[in-house]
């Protein structure tokens, strides 16, 4: 067991709650102690939903452990069914209740209800939230469609031609507490509609059990979030022959690849690449004169597998950044992240320990961090601009406005979200350089956070460190003055490299000339 004050993913029953809360006419009975009801806050506070999740807790207490907790489970299941009248019932247990081994799913199936009951056996001590969401969606899909497996023929992607209608697809994977899922679905539906393709079902977000049974009315599946939907897509392919897409449409290049992949599977004519590129402003902005200073900016990326991989591709191929760190907390996506990192000549960081991520971030000395809510905190401590690209997220990352990550509009949003922190960083540096002019005063409002950046504190802390420099090296007045002209977000790396150079050359005092020589040496 590991004690920590932050975790990237909750236990698997939180993933099950995400699926239940995303859908209609479904109820989830969770065998759990009173303390596990905290998960409600994730949906009412973070997602800002107007209703509680469709979850009934057995909420057993310490005194109940001396009696028959199985009867408590049956009582809560009966009351939930009578009150909420769901079309499908999910039954599971939290990490604490797993130790009691009451087997609530088996109890529910023995109560004689006339509805599908999905028994969720989620190993709380070896799996995490995304796996729990994936397994829940998979078990739900399997339960509701298993009777149609033997009687159904394999579905051809070209069936729409035989039926004389427009092709239909399912969009699978979006859920509550996913990153911008609501807006991504709207954007992808719009793109598909422009291509003459209809959306059959979106699941689990907004779907009902009846919609799950209609999945086989479509020709192919769009696997929008592999962490949630890939297992279900594989099962549908294995049992019904339904093909599914592998390209995630985040960024211009991936969106074009996604459209072409869908067209190939449905035997539709391929579209003109240049015509598609003009649908977003990102390609032109990233090629414009104003964006030249972005080229080569060092970026550190950490998040869920889907968004981290997509961010790395956009950063490298579409914005001209240098990716100096790439990682994920999603062990299910570790192989794909490692492959992407290898292509970028960096070592992948696979961990759920935020301190390891912060340490790697510090060593990489990036000029921009793309990560989760925790990386935003870490970057703020290190004085590095940051943009959130992945869950876990704060309520401020669930905007009321339309703000997708996928498709053409998603590319526009990404450009704004990633580039603006860098622009603000440049502005901060200019103010730092000219702070002695009468127009500027210390304590001005910083764009890097809600508190001002006191440049004197930064310089003073640097001076204190200089007293303890490696091998007794001393910074002269000219050296310190020149160091202050270096942008604050790379000042630490420049200082470290200059000291390394001085040690290598046996230089006891670092002047402005030494700093210039070190820069030439490392470049």
Swiss-Prot record:
GO biological process: light-independent chlorophyll biosynthetic process; photosynthesis, dark reaction
Residues the record marks as active site: 290 (proton donor)
Protein's recorded name: Light-independent protochlorophyllide reductase subunit B
EC number: 1.3.7.7
Subunit-level organization: Protochlorophyllide reductase is composed of three subunits; ChlL, ChlN and ChlB. Forms a heterotetramer of two ChlB and two ChlN subunits.
SUPFAM superfamilies: Helical backbone' metal receptor
Family note: Belongs to the ChlB/BchB/BchZ family.
Annotated spans, Disordered: 451-470
Biased composition (Basic and acidic residues): 461-470
Catalysis: reaction(s): chlorophyllide a + oxidized 2[4Fe-4S]-[ferredoxin] + 2 ADP + 2 phosphate = protochlorophyllide a + reduced 2[4Fe-4S]-[ferredoxin] + 2 ATP + 2 H2O
The entry's keywords: 4Fe-4S, ATP-binding, Chlorophyll biosynthesis, Iron, Iron-sulfur, Metal-binding, Nucleotide-binding, Oxidoreductase, Photosynthesis
Residues annotated to bind [4Fe-4S] cluster: 36
Cofactor binding annotation: Binds 1 [4Fe-4S] cluster per heterodimer. The cluster is bound at the heterodimer interface by residues from both subunits.
Organism from which the protein derives: Prochlorococcus marinus (strain AS9601)
Cofactor requirement: [4Fe-4S] cluster
Residues given in the record as substrate binding sites: 425-426
Pathway assigned to this chain's UniProt record: Porphyrin-containing compound metabolism; chlorophyll biosynthesis (light-independent)
Gene: chlB
PANTHER family hit by this protein: LIGHT-INDEPENDENT PROTOCHLOROPHYLLIDE REDUCTASE SUBUNIT B
GO molecular function: 4 iron, 4 sulfur cluster binding; ATP binding; metal ion binding; oxidoreductase activity, acting on iron-sulfur proteins as donors; oxidoreductase activity, acting on the CH-CH group of donors, iron-sulfur protein as acceptor
Keyword field contains Hydrolase: no
The protein's enzyme class: oxidoreductase
Role description: Component of the dark-operative protochlorophyllide reductase (DPOR) that uses Mg-ATP and reduced ferredoxin to reduce ring D of protochlorophyllide (Pchlide) to form chlorophyllide a (Chlide). This reaction is light-independent. The NB-protein (ChlN-ChlB) is the catalytic component of the complex.
């Amino acid at each position: 067991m590991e004690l920590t004050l932050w975790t990237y993913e909750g236990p698997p029953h939180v993933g099950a709650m995400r699926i239940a809360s995303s859908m209609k006419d479904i109820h989830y009975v969770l065998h759990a102690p009173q303390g596990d009801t905290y998960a409600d806050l994730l949906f009412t506070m973070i997602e800002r939903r107007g209703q509680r999740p469709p979850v009934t807790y057995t909420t057993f207490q310490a005194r109940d452990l001396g009696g028959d907790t199985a009867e408590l489970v049956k009582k809560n299941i009966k009351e939930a069914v009578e009150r909420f009248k769901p079309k499908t019932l999910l039954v599971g247990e939290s990490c604490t209740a797993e130790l009691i081994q009451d087997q609530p799913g088996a109890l529910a199936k023995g109560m004689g209800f006339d509805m599908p009951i999905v028994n969720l056996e989620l190993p709380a001590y070896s799996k995490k939230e995304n796996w729990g969401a994936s397994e829940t969606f998979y078990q739900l899909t399997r339960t509701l469609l298993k009777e149609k497996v033997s009687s159904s023929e394999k579905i051809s992607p070209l069936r729409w031609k035989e039926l004389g209608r427009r092709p239909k697809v399912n969009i699978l994977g979006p859920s509550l507490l996913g990153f911008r899922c609501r807006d991504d679905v709207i954007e992808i539906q719009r793109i598909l509609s422009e291509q003459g393709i209809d959306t059959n079902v979106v699941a689990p977000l907004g779907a009902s059990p009846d919609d799950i049974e209609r999945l086989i009315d479509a020709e192919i599946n769009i696997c929008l979030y592999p962490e949630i939907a890939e297992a279900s897509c594989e099962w549908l392919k294995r049992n019904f022959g339904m093909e599914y897409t592998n390209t995630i449409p985040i960024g211009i290049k991936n969106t074009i690849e996604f459209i072409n992949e869908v067209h190939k599977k449905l035997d539709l004519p391929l579209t003109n690449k240049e015509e598609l590129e003009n649908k977003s402003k990102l390609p032109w902005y990233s090629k414009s004169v104003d964006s030249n200073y972005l080229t080569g900016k060092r970026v550190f990326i950490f998040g869920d597998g889907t968004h981290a991989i997509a961010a790395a591709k956009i950063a490298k191929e579409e914005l001209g950044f240098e990716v100096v760190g790439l990682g994920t907390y999603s062990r299910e996506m570790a192989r794909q992240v490692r492959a992407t990192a290898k292509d970028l000549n960096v070592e992948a960081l696979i961990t759920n320990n935020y301190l390891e991520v912060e340490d790697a971030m510090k060593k990489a000395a990036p000029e921009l961090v793309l990560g989760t809510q925790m990386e935003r905190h870490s970057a703020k401590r290190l004085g590095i601009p940051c943009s959130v690209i992945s869950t876990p997220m704060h309520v401020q990352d669930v905007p009321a406005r339309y703000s997708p990550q996928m498709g053409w509009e998603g590319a526009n949003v990404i450009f704004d979200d990633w580039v603006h922190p860098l622009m603000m960083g440049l502005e901060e540096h200019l103010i730092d350089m000219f702070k002695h002019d009468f127009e500027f005063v210390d304590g001005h409002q910083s764009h890097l956070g809600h508190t001002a950046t006191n440049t004197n504190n930064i310089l003073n802390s640097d001076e204190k460190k200089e007293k303890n420099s490696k091998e007794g090296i001393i910074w002269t007045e000219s050296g310190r003055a020149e160091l202050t002209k270096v942008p604050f977000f790379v000042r630490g790396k420049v200082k470290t490299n200059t000291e390394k150079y001085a040690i290598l050359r046996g230089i006891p005092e670092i002047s402005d000339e030494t700093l210039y020589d070190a820069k030439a040496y490392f470049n």
